[in-house]
């Protein structure tokens, strides 16, 4: 610690919506935290300016004192310095009040009490002081509803199934107990023991975001963390780097399986496993990969956590089959979107009507960037991108055909405000945190209620207001029904007309059909049919001319 940096620190006024005036009185909790911070800082200053070691805390009887003695003394000092503040949640009655306020539903056996503040974890779980410091420095001051419940459950060593709205702090909810548990269990272990923490996510973009938060929280701690990127995978395969040097790995399923099958990564020591966006990872296309990973995590006391904004009953059944007596936490309604999102359904009649609707929104001032527009396919995303370029909008497109580096660059530019409108497929529908997105437009209706909740969850994050507009045509009359149900559960009945609600309910077969088969749609274009026909005729004439020339060349050679 740099003592001169501490002594030269000045005051700083933090911009916050919670501070109404310059002279507003701090809350009891703020006073408590500031006093605790001041005491800790004062002790560190006293300790570092005691250059001649005259104070008791640095005295030693001989120069031969063992490392263990120093460790014990340091632990005693920490206990004296960090007297835990009183718990905010102390009784069952306190927990009932908190759960009612947070709309939390918790089921299972022997459920731990929730926490009311991050400081509660000091007294109850001896939360690492540096981890708490990293949290507060990153301005994570108050736990969200999902964090209040999931942190004590996970730190008590219980398996967890957690469902909470998008933007509610789920990443932090699983990273804090993951780090804390490994800090405790890693004491006394040899160096390069191996991977003990594993986080699985369905997309590379989400994995990068999780890794970035992991780096912030582990700052100053002896935990080696990594994201299994293409570059790291190559190094592991070529034995340039050994996987055993890492404590925590964040990865997508397929890349991890490839490395495991090549015997370059050992998952048998994994103590903490987190499956983020569990509904996606247990859906078709991912379930076999997820199952393969689980089969390699053979540690007998492994703790498993599953998080998502939507967890269908089928996924929950699978979760119960691979977990030990899990606790289930639902924040809000299971299939509802965040209540900070104003949702609206717009009937456009046809594909051409969608483009007209967007242009009308621009003219009427409803089009307020930053905006994300979702489409069902790469082909359609590219087509809309070219159409909006003609309208001179500051727009870019991101999809699976672009390289990871290109996607990272586009995301970075969008976050920095260089891009106002981002067109994408479902590759960005999950987990990726874009702060300040004003609106999400579903240009194409998503195929499931879960996909809808995740898409619109890119706005209205962290308690901020957001808007979600979904365009639909006659072809979408089946696919739009689950969305109406989500809107009802989210309290957005005003966002759709009465005749939409009266549409007949979908049968199971219809739901399956909509889920697994994309709707055939016309190409996105405002070019008149006559012009299209002339273009086609011209292309055919050019093609016929080329063929004639090729035949003439062949005949001449003969």
Swiss-Prot record:
Gene3D superfamilies: P-loop containing nucleotide triphosphate hydrolases. It is found in: Nucleus, Nucleolus. It catalyses: ATP + H2O = ADP + phosphate + H(+). A motif (DEAD box) lies at residues 276-279. GO terms for biological process: endonucleolytic cleavage in 5'-ETS of tricistronic rRNA transcript (SSU-rRNA, 5.8S rRNA, LSU-rRNA); endonucleolytic cleavage in ITS1 to separate SSU-rRNA from 5.8S rRNA and LSU-rRNA from tricistronic rRNA transcript (SSU-rRNA, 5.8S rRNA, LSU-rRNA); endonucleolytic cleavage to generate mature 5'-end of SSU-rRNA from (SSU-rRNA, 5.8S rRNA, LSU-rRNA); snoRNA localization. A motif (Q motif) lies at residues 120-148. Keywords: ATP-binding, Helicase, Hydrolase, Nucleotide-binding, Nucleus, Ribosome biogenesis, RNA-binding, rRNA processing. Signal peptide: none annotated. The keyword Lipid metabolism does not apply. One of its GO terms (molecular function) is RNA helicase activity. Residues 34-53, 64-81, 538-558 have a biased composition (Basic and acidic residues). The Q motif is unique to and characteristic of the DEAD box family of RNA helicases and controls ATP binding and hydrolysis. Interacts with the U3 snoRNA and is associated with the 90S and 40S pre-ribosomes. This is ATP-dependent RNA helicase ROK1. It comes from Scheffersomyces stipitis (strain ATCC 58785 / CBS 6054 / NBRC 10063 / NRRL Y-11545) (Yeast). The gene is ROK1.
């Amino acid at each position: 610690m740099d003592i001169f940096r501490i002594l030269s620190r000045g005051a700083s006024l933090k911009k916050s919506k919670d501070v109404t005036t310059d002279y507003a009185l701090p809350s009891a909790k703020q006073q408590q935290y500031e006093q605790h911070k001041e005491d800790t800082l004062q002790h560190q200053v006293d300790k570092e300016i005691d250059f001649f070691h005259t104070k008791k805390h640095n005295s030693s009887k001989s120069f031969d004192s063992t490392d263990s003695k120093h460790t014990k003394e340091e632990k005693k000092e920490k206990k004296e310095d960090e007297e835990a503040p009183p718990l905010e949640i102390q009784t069952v009655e306190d927990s009932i009040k908190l759960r009612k306020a947070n709309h939390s539903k918790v089921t299972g056996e022997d459920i731990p009490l929730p926490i009311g503040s991050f400081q509660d974890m000091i007294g109850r779980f001896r939360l690492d002081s540096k981890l708490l410091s990293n949290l507060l420095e990153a301005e994570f001051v108050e736990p969200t509803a999902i964090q209040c419940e999931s942190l004590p459950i996970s730190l008590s060593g219980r398996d967890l199934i957690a469902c909470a709205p998008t933007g509610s702090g789920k990443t932090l909810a699983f990273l804090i107990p993951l780090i804390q548990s490994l800090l405790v269990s890693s004491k006394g272990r040899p160096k390069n023991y191996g991977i003990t923490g594993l986080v699985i996510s369905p997309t590379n973009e989400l994995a990068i975001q999780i890794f970035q938060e992991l780096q912030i929280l582990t700052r100053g701690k002896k935990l080696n963390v990594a994201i299994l990127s293409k570059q790291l995978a190559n190094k592991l395969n070529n034995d340039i780097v050994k996987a055993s040097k890492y404590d925590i790995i964040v990865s997508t399923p397929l890349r991890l399986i490839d490395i495991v099958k090549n015997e370059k990564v050992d998952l048998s020591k994994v103590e903490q496993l987190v499956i983020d966006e569990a509904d996606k990872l247990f859906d078709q296309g991912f379930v076999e990969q997820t199952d393969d990973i689980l089969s390699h995590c053979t540690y007998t006391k492994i703790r498993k956590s599953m998080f998502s904004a939507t967890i269908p009953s089928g996924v929950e059944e699978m979760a119960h089959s691979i977990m030990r007596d899990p606790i289930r936490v639902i924040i809000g309604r299971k299939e509802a979107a965040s209540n900070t999102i104003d949702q609206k359904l717009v009937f456009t009649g046809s594909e051409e009507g969608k483009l007209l609707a967007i242009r009308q929104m621009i003219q009427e001032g409803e089009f307020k960037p930053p905006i994300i527009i979702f489409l069902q396919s790469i082909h359609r995303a590219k087509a809309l991108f070219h159409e909006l370029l003609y309208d001179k909008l500051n727009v870019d497109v991101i999809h699976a055909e672009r390289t990871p580096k290109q996607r990272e660059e586009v995301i970075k530019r969008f976050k920095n405000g260089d891009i106002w409108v981002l067109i994408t497929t479902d590759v960005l529908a999950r987990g990726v945190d874009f702060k300040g997105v004003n609106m999400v437009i579903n240009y194409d209706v998503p195929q499931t209620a879960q996909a809808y909740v995740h898409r619109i969850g890119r706005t209205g994050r962290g308690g901020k207001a957001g808007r979600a507009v979904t365009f639909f045509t006659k072809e979408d009359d089946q696919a739009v029904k689950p969305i109406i149900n989500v809107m009802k559960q989210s309290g957005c009945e005003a966002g759709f007309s009465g005749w939409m609600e009266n549409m007949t309910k979908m049968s199971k077969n219809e739901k399956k059909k909509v889920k697994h088969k994309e709707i055939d749609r016309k190409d996105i274009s405002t070019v008149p049919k006559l012009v299209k026909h002339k273009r086609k005729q011209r292309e055919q004439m050019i093609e016929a001319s080329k063929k004639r020339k090729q035949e003439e060349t062949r005949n001449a050679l003969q």
